Amino acid sequence: TSRTPARPRSRSEDCAERACSARFALVVDAARATSWLRCESKTSDTWNLAVVDRPVVAVASATYRFQKQGNRYRLDTEARASGVLAVFYSGTLVQVSEGVMDAQGFVPARYSEKRGRRPERRYRFDSLSRHIRQEGDPAIDFAYPDGTQDRLTIFFQLGLLARADARRFRPGQKFVLPLAGSRRIDEPFFRVVRQERMRTNAGEFDALHISVEKPGDQDAPRFDIWLAPELKMLPVRIRVFDHGGGGKIVDQVLRRRPQEIL
């Protein structure tokens, strides 16, 4: 029997397969530890972070980029310190995560992190052996469970999980999301606090407040995240309190609504 010829792909279908992104920028007020997120482009997912101090002087900037083609993704960030902050953080911070996205969300395959003049950290996720290889001298292998995230994907994975299973995100619910740490798997403890009304430069949003801590480690950073259902559970606020870093607080707040949403 003869087969029906395949329908030629339309231009719009080809475009849909290409890397998509929306451009965002963040600004952090170090006094209030507040940052802002604003959309700049429909063609690529990019977040730009600027840290300012009194009187609103830029001391650092960072850019986050997200690309997706088919089921493969790339998420990267570059942060560069300047001014006062450069005294404490020399050089740049570069992070790159690559992998696939499936029904469970982000599945990292490679992650790298370079901080200033320090040696680059590189992680490879072997989906067959279920081990992560942290490259170095010596290299270290450790097992990882399903759903493990890296330091870039974890916040966005949280939003995807909330969209997929709202029952896990009712106030009072608690859960663990495994995170690839240095030489081991960390298990941050997530607690759903409550729905709160968040006021941002992008408008007001109902947002789900989630607190994140690492049990048994008083020096580990604490995170608070607010996810907005109106924005498909993307964060409208992320606040980090670093106990081990002298009590520093970084608070990021949405500045402009993104035009492209994961």
What spans do the regions from the language model cover?
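Acidic, serine/threonine-rich low-complexity disordered tracts
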Residues: T1-S127, R167-L262
